[in-house]
């Protein structure tokens, strides 16, 4: 008799991601994966030959299910499995809970396992600040242990929430594409559960008798995502019927495909709108489709030093009006002390 369907689903999702990681490790640079010859990745003397994959685990149902699936699948594929839990220090006793998570991960057979404490700032609000601190800690842990990848437990439900949050902000198609299955420097972060619903992950924990911790912040109406999860999505499903989460997740993937195509188009078009000095020619920018032109403008602002997290669509729209609605207006101030101005038919974006 095979495993429970929920357990089978989470294991299959992790197995596929581990196969992807191994394929990439065994593929020489510049050689298509389909034609690569199996080989052992070159590693520094003294390091274990088996690649290490870490799981980021809060102790909640999603990440505990992910940890259990990694613990099961990794040794079958010759992969070492480890875990990291991040103590944000935002709740009383969070250090003790982090220690409990470490014990649970070790009981699953993961090694190495560690808890790392972070200080959460205030930039961008509590949710964004906690996320930034968490990823910084995970980056450091991955570098410290030489991990090939870090698995994150985001589910299809999380993806649906992310799409709705982007929609509410009036964001572009990139925000509507939600979370990528592969992200971070060198594809460090992997999200195996983006096609797995939250209920399946919780069921997998239950049938495996895995203890889980329900973060009270996830039910706190002070947090936007919590309100969306407990009020917004249920209201949508009541009004529109079941299948809203699946539809939003599908929208994310379709949007990502479109956004990737537009990004590629913009990169290819950028060379054609720059003059001999590297400046942007307004007439050539004007001739491009708006979606392509604005991507070029955003890239130019980022290259000039504007922080991506503070550079919003309204900023790019203001810069775009220097091209499409030119009336002799003055310079546009962007985040990061970056200034955009039109000079003699050229658009100049640089530090003020």
Curated annotation (Swiss-Prot):
EC number: 6.3.4.19
Keyword Transferase in annotation: no
Pfam families: ATP_bind_3, TilS
Gene Ontology terms: cellular component: cytoplasm
Name by which UniProt lists this protein: tRNA(Ile)-lysidine synthase
Chief place where the protein resides: cytoplasm
UniProt xrefs under InterPro entries: Rossmann-like_a/b/a_fold (IPR014729), TilS/TtcA_N (IPR011063), tRNA_Ile_lys_synt (IPR012094), tRNA_Ile_lys_synt_N (IPR012795), tRNA_Ile_lys_synt_subst-bd (IPR015262)
Catalytically driven reaction(s): cytidine(34) in tRNA(Ile2) + L-lysine + ATP = lysidine(34) in tRNA(Ile2) + AMP + diphosphate + H(+)
One GO-annotated biological process of the protein: tRNA modification
Compartment(s) of residence: Cytoplasm
Record's keyword terms, sorted: ATP-binding, Cytoplasm, Ligase, Nucleotide-binding, tRNA processing
């Amino acid at each position: 008799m095979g495993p429970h369907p929920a357990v089978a689903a989470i294991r299959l999702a992790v197995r596929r991601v581990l196969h992807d990681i191994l394929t990439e490790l065994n593929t020489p640079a510049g050689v298509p994966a389909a034609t690569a010859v199996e080989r052992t990745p070159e590693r520094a003397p003294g390091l274990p030959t088996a690649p290490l994959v870490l799981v980021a685990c809060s102790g909640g149902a999603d990440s505990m299910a992910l940890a259990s699936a990694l613990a099961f699948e990794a040794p079958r594929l010759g992969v070492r499995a480890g875990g990291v839990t991040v103590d944000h220090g935002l709740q009383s006793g969070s250090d003790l809970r982090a220690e409990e998570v470490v014990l649970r991960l070790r009981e699953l057979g993961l090694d190495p396992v560690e808890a790392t404490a972070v200080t959460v700032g205030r930039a961008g609000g509590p949710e964004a600040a906690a996320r930034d601190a968490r990823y910084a800690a995970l980056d450091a842990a991955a570098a410290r242990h030489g991990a090939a990848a870090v698995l994150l437990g985001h589910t299809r439900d999380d993806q649906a929430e992310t799409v709705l949050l982007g929609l509410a902000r009036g964001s572009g198609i990139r925000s509507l594409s939600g979370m990528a299955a592969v992200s971070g420097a060198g594809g460090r972060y992997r999200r195996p559960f983006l096609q797995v619903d939250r209920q399946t992950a919780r069921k997998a924990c239950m049938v495996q008798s895995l203890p889980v911790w329900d973060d009270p912040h996830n039910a706190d109406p002070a947090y936007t995502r919590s309100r969306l999860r407990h009020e917004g999505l249920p209201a949508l499903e009541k009004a529109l019927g079941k299948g809203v989460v699946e539809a939003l997740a599908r929208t994310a993937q379709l949007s990502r495909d479109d956004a990737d195509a537009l990004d590629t188009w913009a990169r290819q078009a950028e060379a054609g709108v720059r003059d001999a000095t590297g400046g942007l020619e307004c007439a050539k920018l004007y001739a491009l489709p708006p979606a392509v032109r604005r991507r070029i403008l955003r890239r130019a602002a980022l290259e000039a030093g504007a922080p991506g997290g503070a550079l919003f669509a309204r900023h790019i729209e203001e810069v775009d009006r220097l091209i499409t609605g030119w009336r002799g207006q003055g310079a546009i101030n962007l985040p990061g002390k970056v200034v955009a101005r039109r000079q003699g038919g050229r658009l100049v974006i640089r530090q003020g």
